[in-house]
Every structure is written in C-alpha cells, then in structure tokens.
C-alpha cells in the first residue's frame, strides 16, 4: 500500500506523515498437537536443505512476546487480538503465523517460574481459529536472554523454511542503552562481553559460543498513576518509567528483584537468519544505533523514537498487512499504529513511528561521519535544551538525529546531504504534535540518537561512552571519541 505526504489536523493539533497469560489461561485456548521439536527449541529434524517452490513463496511471521514483567495483561490481550484477525489456513501449503509467549502466572508474581510456549495460529477448514502448541519450554526459562531468543528463532528457521521471514518483538525496552543502565546509571559499570556469535560465510549459523546475558539488579522507580502505562515500564502501576534494554524478564520478590535484559548487540548476534522486516512494539527502539546494529539482519525495521503506550500496535489488522497480502506491508502496520493514537486526546495522543530501509544506512553513516568529524567542537558545545528530545523526566539519552546535527553547526550543504541520505532510508515516519503533554515534537528525522556527554555532566557518562564505542554506529561514524 502506497502512502503519500499527508497532514492531519485534529483541532489545533497537527501530525505529519510521510512515505518515500498464565499457563492455565493459555492451555484453555489451545488444541494441542505432538510437538514438532524438543523443548529446547533446537529444531530437531527440521528441514535445513534446499527449499521447495512452495517454501520459497511462503511467508512466516513470528510474534516474540516476552511478558514475564508488568506488561503481562497487555501482551495477552495482543495475542487475543491477533487470533481475532485474519489467520492463514492450515500448514503446510499456506503461510505461517507463530507466537512465542511467556508471561507471569498472575500480575506481580515474579517469583513463580512459568512455562513459555511456541504456538502456531491458523484457521481450520471450518473457519475456526486454532492454536497449536509446537514447543513447551522448561518452566523458569528466561525469554529476554540472547540464548532463548536464538533457540526460538533457530527452531523457526529449521522447521518452517520460507522465502520471507518477519518478526514483531513485543516487551519492555530502552533502545541502545546497556542492561541495567537506565534504572540506576550511577551503579552501571561497563564490562566488555565476548562475541556470542559470528556470521559464517554468507549464512547466519552460530558457532558454539556461550551467550552472556546476565541478570542486573532491578530498582523500582517512581511512578505517576495519572499517566498511561508504557512499554518501557517496570512496575505494576500505570505511568511507571522504564528500565529496559531489549526485552525484560523481571524475576524475584519485592526488594530482591533482578532483571534479565538483552543489549542490542546481543539481540542482533542471536538472530540466525535474515528477516524481511522486524517491527518493535517496545519503547525507545527508534534510534540509529538500533537500526545500524540490525542492518545486516533485516531489510526493514519499524520502531518508535519515544515510549510506546502499553496498547502498542494494532494486532487485529496486523496479519492482513503482513500475511494476507502477497507482499508483506509493514508500512501499513506502522500507519495503523499511528492512526489509532492520532485519534486520541490528551496524554493518549502520543506516538512516534518510522519504517527504515536498512539497506540504505551505510550512506547515512558516511554523511554523519563527515559531519561529526567537521563539527567536533560544535557537538561538545550543544545546549541540550535546544535539541529535540524523545524522553520524559531526566532520562536524557534520546534526541533527534537531525536536530543534534543542526545544533552542532552543520553547513547548508551538509544538511542537504543529510536530508538526501535520510530520504533514502526513512520509508515512513509519523509523530503526534506532543508526547504525553510533556514535550512538543518540532523536529523529526525518523531516528533518535545519543547526544555525547562527558564527565563534567555526570561521572557515569564515562562508563556509558565506553559502552557506546562498542556499537556498530559509533564504529562507523566516530560520534564518541
């Protein structure tokens, strides 16, 4: 579906769009079958050889729903919405819709281990929605770890060969930030991690390495019960600020919580195949750092620069765009997301979203590298209050990429080159005029980015800068020296 430039007015507000459950609850809704593979998700007996003609035409969509946290009820509702929408016919001659789901037994029950499932949703010959359990994982499995994420994706790849893979990742998140940093930055210490996986030739098979997703202390932040729940929240109350990296399993009891979180490099390394698209139904993932880390793992990526209200994407219409159509249309999913929020009012009229062509990101990196090199002193002199923010409270780690470059003193020619590079890679972008009544959005490039800080601001930025230097975006552009 093609989108044109469109301005939507809602009263005096304007928005710009452009185009270039618990175990028992889930078992009640399933018709179980003999699992295709073992509970470790290794994909035993899967077809890893040459694909047939039908397999080349097949589309596979995976919803990875990591809800062993405060989003439990919202993520269960998302799956029910998915079941109520368009469903593919029975395997093996039709497209595949898979859901990996893991939630707490009940709200706040973070000390009770539960069982994750991989299920397949389809419509039978009588038009009934069927949910088949393919894999039952061991109770206590941590879903927000690179090891489990890799196990699930490997099972999907080995057992459902296809010409097109897509994924929706739904959980808590805080973009490029390292695990544990967001909730308590003064306690963060950068510790280098081993590379957990390497690409072999032109494939994406893993070498036998150890994944290093480590639990970090959980610190419950303050919350404002008057605000809506967001997909970066920590507690069981609405309006809670976020503390996540990519995904979250919150484990333990009050006063002794720990959190399992993936960092963006771990997330990327754990992916064993190439995706056509990845859509993040999670907060603050819309950064250039995230996109660049994933550019060799997917062709397109959809994400939000701001937090995501807990209702998230529109799951009722999602499969119509991603599976029913001959060619998947992730842009339509992004558009549906934005339209459901621009129609709201007050704090609920809050959303940003962009769809990125990852194949065009290298040109953007070249342009930005030259600008960063030419305006090193300008970057250091930026007044943060002059730059477009995408964060609430004092979590000052997410600013608009173009706004940073403008404030650094880029020339007219440099800005022209930047705009041309952005136009090539930002397929779609949309934003509401305000976000939760806390800040206006006046500049929007389709990417957030870190605004480098030094020890004169806070001592822990030395640790954050050390971590940031390991990201592929910084290696390509030299933003942080």
Language model features with spans:
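Functional beta-strand-loop-alpha-helix junction segments that form "active/interaction loops"
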Residues: 121-158
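Loop/turn elements at helix/coil->beta-strand transitions in domains of secreted/extracellular proteins
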Residues: 57-60, 90-97, 160-166, 272-277, ...
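Terminal, contiguous helix-loop blocks that mediate binding/assembly
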Residues: 24-26, 42, 194-481
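Bacterial N-terminal signal peptides
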Residues: 8-17
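Bacterial Sec-dependent N-terminal signal peptides
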Residues: 1-2, 16-55
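Extracytoplasmic/secreted cell-surface and envelope-processing proteins
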Residues: 70-75, 106-110, 175-179, 285-290, ...
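Surface-exposed loop and adjacent secondary-structure segments within mature catalytic domains
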Residues: 101-136, 164, 168-251
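Bacterial N-terminal signal peptides that target proteins for export
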Residues: 1-9
